[in-house]
């Protein structure tokens, strides 16, 4: 039973939020040399709870809308399969999603009391967007934007909890990992194109079509690396953050694999896996760059 719930939560994708929180903490360490461990741990727990919530609610609504019965499930796309396969009850998944949302909201509420309106605004955005992600946001063609903004706000919120201020460094750094996370969502939407389109979803792949969407793929790493290189050149961030460029060979491999398999649900799996690997490696190295003294 536990394995079914871990599958429903998409445990492997939680690393995106772990990296985002870690980045906020690493920028804090680089800036001040101190971290409040209790608040850091609580932040991590709250963010993971909110991330689990959006994945569970997304699984529930995709099943209710009939999307997951139309998609071909892969290790990276097509839903978790726990509901179509009858491994968990839809109501249980929905209730679990709400419970995680409440848990994350309570932790966030604690930080609102401590740190005020900035955290309140971030928390309000998080709760509203998580609840309406699968029923509204994806239908409006804003899923990739939501993920990028979510990642950025996690970094900003983590930093603000530690420092009670926001800086250009933390905002720009947040955009870097937010865009990297959005790239993963973007590439995993290729195999789901037909089912998503039939059920009213509007991903970037649907809006532009599979072939044109391949060209959009380049934009994500260009934005992230453009910020890193530009900020390092202007001494806004440590030059050591350039170690994230070591992940470039992985993204080149991803692009090649995507081009050769854009319409093949089976052959595109390696492209999705290498894109996920790139996102995590680049993000982790970026975090490490702030810690190197």
Annotate each language-model stretch with its function.
Residues 236-293:
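Extended hydrophobic alpha-helices typical of membrane-associated regions
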Residues 49-74, 183-205:
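Acidic (Asp/Glu-rich) catalytic motifs at the cytosolic membrane interface
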Residues 79-168:
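Intramembrane alpha-helical segments
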Residues 72-112, 205-236, 276-282:
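Multi-pass membrane catalytic core of lipid/isoprenoid biosynthesis enzymes
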Residues 32-57, 120-121, 125-131, 169-187:
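Membrane-embedded alpha-helical segments that form the functional core of polytopic membrane enzymes
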Residues 1-38, 42, 46, 138-144:
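Topogenic membrane-insertion module of multi-pass membrane proteins
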Residues 25-45, 105-120, 155-175, 227-240, ...:
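Helix-coil boundary and interhelical linker segments in multi-pass alpha-helical membrane proteins
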């Amino acid at each position: 039973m536990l394995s079914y719930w871990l599958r429903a939560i998409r445990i492997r994708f939680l690393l995106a939020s772990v990296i985002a929180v870690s980045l906020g903490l690493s920028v804090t360490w680089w800036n001040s040399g101190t971290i409040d461990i209790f608040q850091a741990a609580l932040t991590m727990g709250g963010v993971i709870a909110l991330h689990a919530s959006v994945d569970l609610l997304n699984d529930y609504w995709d099943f209710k809308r009939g999307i997951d019965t139309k998609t071909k499930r892969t290790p990276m796309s097509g839903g978790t399969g726990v509901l179509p396969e009858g491994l968990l009850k839809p109501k249980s998944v929905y209730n679990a999603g709400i419970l995680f949302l409440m848990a994350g909201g309570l932790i966030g509420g604690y930080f609102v009391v401590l740190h005020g309106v900035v955290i309140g605004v971030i928390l309000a955005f998080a709760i509203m967007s998580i609840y309406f992600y699968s029923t509204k946001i994806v239908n409006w063609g804003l899923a990739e934007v939501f993920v990028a903004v979510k990642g950025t706000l996690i970094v900003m919120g983590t930093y603000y909890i530690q420092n009670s201020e926001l800086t250009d460094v933390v905002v720009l750094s947040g955009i870097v990992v937010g865009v990297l996370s959005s790239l993963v969502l973007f590439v995993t939407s290729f195999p789901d194109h037909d089912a998503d389109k039939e059920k009213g979803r509007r991903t970037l792949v649907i809006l532009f079509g599979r072939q044109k969407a391949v060209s959009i793929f380049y934009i994500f790493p260009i934005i992230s690396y453009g910020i890193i290189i530009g900020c390092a050149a202007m001494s806004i961030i440590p030059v050591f953050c350039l170690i994230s460029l070591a992940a470039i060979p992985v993204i080149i491999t991803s692009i090649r694999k995507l081009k050769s398999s854009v319409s093949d649900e089976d052959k595109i799996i390696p492209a999705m896996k290498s894109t996920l690997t790139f996102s995590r490696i680049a993000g982790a190295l970026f975090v490490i760059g702030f810690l190197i003294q």
